[in-house]
Amino acid sequence: MSQTTSEDFTTARIEADPALPVIRITRDFRATPAQLFRAHTDPELFARWVGPTSISTEIDQWDARDGGSWRYVARREDFETAFRGCFHQVTPDRIVQTFTWEEQPDGVALETLTFEDLGNGWTRLRAQSLVDSFEGRDAWLSSGMETGVNEGYAALDELIADGAAD
């Protein structure tokens, strides 16, 4: 268990590495690492919180284990898109997976998520996405991803508070 810092990450901090095509997201949750892990690996829970509130998520394929794959469709009345990837490592404190937006199938990102127990009922989620190019990274950042990340994490806060990830 690590020490809690004085920095406040109750809203997501999204940073681009100037030297690498990397996006880093840091966010603290009033949750245990086990609750966050479950919310990221249980397809029913994942579909309830991921993405912006204006979009619903339908899980098409989900096998959250080393070597497993996933695919989901995000849609609203006037819009539909799909994402897919493979789980490379799934452990209670770390998930490593690929992430591909099917509209750009050649653009594959390698994502690493870690769940750090801060004590006192708080866990820090760190997500790092190594994107295939600086252009791809910058396109992600300008796509409105910040809204989707923050709205999704707010929904995750509610899901955890309701006890759904226990």
What function would you assign to each model-found segment?
Residues 1-8, 131-166:
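A conserved amphipathic terminal alpha-helix motif
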Residues 1-56:
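Hydrophobic ligand-binding cavity/cleft-lining segments
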Residues 20-26, 33, 57, 69, ...:
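Intrinsic-disorder/low-complexity, polar/charged segments enriched in Ser/Thr/Lys/Arg/Asp/Glu/Gln
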Residues 22, 96, 100-150:
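Beta-strand/loop substructures that line and gate deep hydrophobic ligand-binding cavities in soluble
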Residues 24-25, 44-82, 166:
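Short beta-edge strand/loop motif at the mouth of beta-sheet-based domains
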Residues 26-27, 59-62, 82-88, 99-100, ...:
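Hydrophobic/aromatic beta-strand elements that line small-molecule binding cavities or substrate pockets
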Residues 33-34, 65, 88-93, 115-124:
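A short, structured loop/turn motif at beta-sheet edges
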Residues 36, 40, 46, 70, ...:
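Hydrophobic pocket/interface hotspot
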